[in-house]
Amino acid sequence: KESSDIVIMDNNLISIANAVLYGRTIFKSIRKFIIYQLTVNCCALVLSFVGPFIGIPTPITVIQMLWINMIMDTLAGLAFSYEAPLKEYLKEKPKKRNQSIINKFMYTEILITGVYSSFVSIFYLCSPYIKSFFRVDRDNIYFMTGFFALFIFMGIFNAFNARTTRINLLSNISKNKVFIILFMCISIVQMYLIYFGGSLFRTYGLSFKELMIVLAMAFTVIPVDIFRKLLFKRRGVI
């Protein structure tokens, strides 16, 4: 036993296949979480750097960032950890011991989605056209509430991008009910914060039109990533 690489405790060779399957599932879940976290962090970093140059020193307040970090560090990690072990994982080639955990597919998703999310955020903040959809007030409270909602909902939609390499973002999603429940809860809490967060979260209730503008802009991260996946699929990478 001491010199063995694998010890079968139940004298059943199927246990080896199960161990490999669950090991690969955990490995993939870690990768999904890394994609999600680095994408959101990339966007947040760009905003923190660019914000002061466009006249908005704090696009995201400290309290809002605490809520964002709770989603990224705790709830998202929990959601991805419940990804189901799929039999198709056993058909993949073995991973090398020295293989990097971040591959080319992940780099492109982090870079493209992160940069695109940053572009959407900056466009929102700088565009007079977008601002014209929001009620006018001295402190831009409705406009900045919309930006907070935009940032969160882009993260929620991007979670669906990160959880699968397939074009169909809902592929096998029914096997991870925790993912569905957690992101539904995050969406509900976010809606509550928009309308009842008040001065603590710097949020004030959006009108239906304002909310639809925010959701439509946030949703665009999905077709952008689907297009990226189509390019990879055409090249035979996925």
Give the label of every model feature segment.
Residues 1-166:
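Membrane-embedded transport module
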Residues 49-58, 191-207:
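Transmembrane helix-loop junctions at the membrane interface of multipass transporters and ion channels
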Residues 120-124, 185-199:
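Hydrophobic alpha-helical transmembrane segments in multi-pass integral membrane proteins
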Residues 147-166, 182-190, 221-228:
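Hydrophobic alpha-helical segments of multi-pass membrane transport proteins
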Residues 148, 207-221:
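Small-residue-rich transmembrane alpha-helices that serve as helix-helix interface/gating elements
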Residues 171-179:
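Cytoplasmic-side transmembrane-helix entry/capping segments in multi-pass membrane proteins
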Residues 181, 211-214, 238:
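Multi-pass alpha-helical transmembrane bundle typical of ion/small-solute transporters
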Residues 227-238:
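Membrane-interface capping segments at transmembrane-helix boundaries
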